[in-house]
Amino acid sequence: MSKTVALKFLQMSLVTLTTDYGSRDPYAAALKGRLYTEVPDARIVDISHEVSPLHLEEAAFLLGHSFGHYPKGSIHLVAVDEGHSKEVRPLLMLKEGHWFIGPDNGVLHMIRPEIRADQLLEIDFRSEATNFPALDIYVPAAAHLLRSGAGDLLGHPTDTMIEKKIMRPTLGNEKASITGIVQHIDAYGNLISNIPGSWIKEYQGDRSLEIDLGRRQKISKLCTHYREMDDGLPLALINSMGYLEIAVKRQAGPANNGASQLLGLYLRDRIEVRFT
């Protein structure tokens, strides 16, 4: 086998799964079983099966901030709100050298929307009256790609897909503030905002910084590591994904869900950074 062919096979032999199926039901296991049946030497990676039910933004966030760490040519299957209440087109998208297979419900559009898709197809083959599109449509499409099949054989090109409005941070008057929201809460209860750290660096200059969390809660400095703050106190830092994050050191767990519970902040709640 030539080096080029071997590299292509290596790149096309990995598929990731992102679903809202959870871990107690057989749905995620069925996807894996069908994939292994179709391609016994496939490598399957679970990004998450714990996406909140029908939560497209969460699925797009998880996949959007993880797919770039996988080799180009990887296949990413996303199954969230697949269309059990109405028929939804199955799509195949090529972006940044990665294949994405999922429903046309907005989730594919929200995966790094600032990057234009290189190819977009509506998958043609369908099982009649399927109640499980991921198993009956997405998996066979992924298996075709895993066997190094051409993507354009799976369907026909389309110029459109459903787009969902994405909440973006806004810049205040005279660039004196940045207003954003909580876009994700991780397993530690850390609040990940949609405010890029690059914005703070660009607009702060030599001014002081104050982060307003509402309810008269404020943070007046940025830390560089979680260990810089005393236990139980909130801190702000720019996380590894490049976003402003609010955390509370050693306050995670079922009984105390970190910064989210301690500060009373949840998804889409407002966070404002002021410069003075």
Question: How should these model regions be labeled?
Answer:
Residues A129-G205:
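Anionic-ligand-binding alpha/beta catalytic cores of soluble enzymes and soluble regulatory domains
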Residues E38-R43, H55-E58, P71-G73, L77-V80, ...:
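Active-site histidine-anchored catalytic micro-motif
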